[in-house]
């Protein structure tokens, strides 16, 4: 049984159009979680001003900029970086887990109660968080050296959360299987991940150059939009993996 991009796009479109209200609700909820974390843990204003003024970009090297900082500024930058990583991981884990649980709940022939699905989500989130931490770590290392290794790793590891949701493999096996399947179906997985990255880049560029509305509101709208598109990517990849298991 051959799997085509067109077939996957049609299946994804039908699912998303049918469940768009729930997807938007989950996306908004994930965006509010990011905002709540930002409100609860306020980073140093001076460090934020350095980043927002794009001094990182104007500097010849990030390492040169870090070396020119005082010990206090270095500590604050480290704290800010850790805070942003955990904010990203928490919101991503919640979004991923919620969308995967939604798909599993709707595609399960045995009708399960909402309470059962919520319990499954709560049990799934800790292992998903650890997996996201591992995959994000390797992807960021890839982006640190060159852009292409980071993009390539993003494609290879894209299926690992979906494989984990089937509860048949441990974390390492999920990563190994994701790499193996993605390499064999690079056109299907790679196209979707690259499309998501392009959408993310366009949205970030457009909203970061918008000065009419307040920054907090822009941050909220940007997060909601990115979460919706990321949810669509998850639906696409989940459908692909289901068809892959049947083939």
Swiss-Prot record:
Subcellular localization, as worded in the UniProt entry: Cell membrane
Primary location: membrane
Transferase is among the record's keywords: no
TM regions (residue ranges): 20-40, 82-102, 114-134, 137-157, 188-208, 217-237
Entry membrane topology: Multi-pass membrane protein
InterPro entries, alphabetized: UPF0259
Superkingdom, taxonomy of origin: Bacteria
GO cellular component: plasma membrane
Keywords tagged on the record: Cell membrane, Membrane, Transmembrane, Transmembrane helix
UniProt record similarity statement: Belongs to the UPF0259 family.
Record-given protein name: UPF0259 membrane protein BUsg_265
């Amino acid at each position: 049984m051959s799997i085509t991009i067109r077939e996957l796009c049609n299946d994804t479109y039908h699912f998303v159009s049918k469940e768009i209200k729930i997807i938007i609700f989950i996306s908004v909820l994930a965006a509010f979680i990011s905002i709540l974390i930002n409100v609860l843990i306020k980073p140093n204003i001076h460090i934020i001003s350095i980043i927002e003024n794009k001094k990182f970009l104007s500097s010849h090297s990030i390492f040169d900029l870090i070396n020119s900082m005082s010990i206090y500024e270095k500590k604050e930058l480290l704290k800010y970086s850790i805070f942003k990583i955990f904010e990203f991981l928490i919101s991503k884990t919640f979004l991923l887990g919620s969308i995967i649980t939604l798909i599993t709940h709707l595609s399960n022939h045995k009708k399960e109660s909402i309470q059962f699905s919520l319990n499954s989500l709560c049990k799934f989130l800790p292992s998903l968080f650890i997996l996201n931490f591992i995959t994000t770590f390797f992807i960021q290392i890839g982006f640190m050296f060159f852009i292409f290794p980071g993009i390539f790793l993003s494609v290879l590891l894209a299926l690992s959360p979906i494989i984990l949701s089937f509860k048949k493999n441990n974390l390492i096996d999920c990563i190994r299987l994701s790499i193996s399947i993605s390499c064999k179906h690079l056109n299907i997985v790679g196209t979707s991940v690259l499309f998501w990255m392009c959408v993310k880049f366009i949205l970030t560029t457009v909203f970061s150059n918008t000065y009419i509305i307040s920054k907090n509101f822009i941050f909220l709208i940007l997060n909601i939009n990115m979460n919706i598109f990321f949810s669509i990517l998850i639906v696409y990849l989940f459908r692909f993996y289901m068809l892959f298991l049947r083939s």
